[in-house]
Swiss-Prot record:
F-type ATPases have 2 components, F(1) - the catalytic core - and F(0) - the membrane proton channel. F(1) has five subunits: alpha(3), beta(3), gamma(1), delta(1), epsilon(1). F(0) has four main subunits: a(1), b(1), b'(1) and c(10-14). The alpha and beta chains form an alternating ring which encloses part of the gamma chain. F(1) is attached to F(0) by a central stalk formed by the gamma and epsilon chains, while a peripheral stalk is formed by the delta, b and b' chains. It is a single-pass membrane protein. It comes from Daucus carota. Belongs to the ATPase B chain family. CDD domains: ATP-synt_Fo_b (cd06503). The keyword Transmembrane helix applies. This is ATP synthase subunit b, chloroplastic. F(1)F(0) ATP synthase produces ATP from ADP in the presence of a proton or sodium gradient. F-type ATPases consist of two structural domains, F(1) containing the extramembraneous catalytic core and F(0) containing the membrane proton channel, linked together by a central stalk and a peripheral stalk. During catalysis, ATP synthesis in the catalytic domain of F(1) is coupled via a rotary mechanism of the central stalk subunits to proton translocation. One of its GO terms (molecular function) is proton-transporting ATP synthase activity, rotational mechanism. In plastids the F-type ATPase is also known as CF(1)CF(0).
Length: 181
């Protein structure tokens, strides 16, 4: 490992006029490293996030379609209830004298129950959409945080080792010794 490090150190001392060399100054290259890591995270994370969001969008759209089908069924039931209402109204004309008030109550009950069912289905659809959106947002946040944390830990573990620490400490001790002399 020391030979490899020494070879990189010797590469860092190439003449700078018109040639390519390695910059071993950690403070000068840290900004470049961070920008490279962020660029890699954006480049590779974008596809994962878009796939995740597309899947979540499909689920939400499927939920909306299911809710719309339920709504269509409720509308169909409403139409059936209306036809029954018409039938009941025809019978009401025949029995107006005896049972008009009872028929009117039945009609109102049909309308109220159908209206209540439609409202419940609409509320269920809206709650499902909101829940799926919040769940998708939370999953995306968690995924981005995990990827950023893994990238940062990978960068730290690849950049730091014991030999580099010891060399940095020795260099700093040497500079402090030179300052105090």
């Amino acid at each position: 490992m020391k030979n490899v490090t020494d070879s990189f150190v010797s590469l860092g001392h190439w003449p700078s006029a018109g040639s390519f060399g390695f910059n071993t100054d950690i403070l000068a290259t840290n900004l470049i490293n961070l920008s490279v890591v962020l660029g890699v995270l954006v480049f590779f994370g974008k596809g994962v996030l878009s796939d995740l969001l597309d899947n979540r969008k499909q689920r939400i759209l499927n939920t909306i379609r299911n809710s719309e089908e339920l709504r269509g069924g409720a509308i169909e039931q409403l139409e059936k209830a209306r036809t029954r209402l018409r039938k009941v109204e025809m019978e009401a004309d025949q029995f107006r004298v005896n049972g008009y008030s009872e028929i009117e109550r039945e009609r109102l009950n049909f309308i109220n129950s159908t209206s209540k069912t439609l409202k419940q289905l609409e509320n269920y659809k809206n709650e499902t959409i909101n829940f799926e959106q919040q769940r998708a947002i939370n999953q995306v946040r968690q995924l981005v945080f995990q990827q950023a944390l893994q990238g940062a830990l990978g960068t730290l573990s690849s950049c730091l080792n014991n030999e580099l620490h010891l060399r940095t400490i020795r260099a700093n001790i040497g500079m402090l010794g030179a300052i105090t002399d």
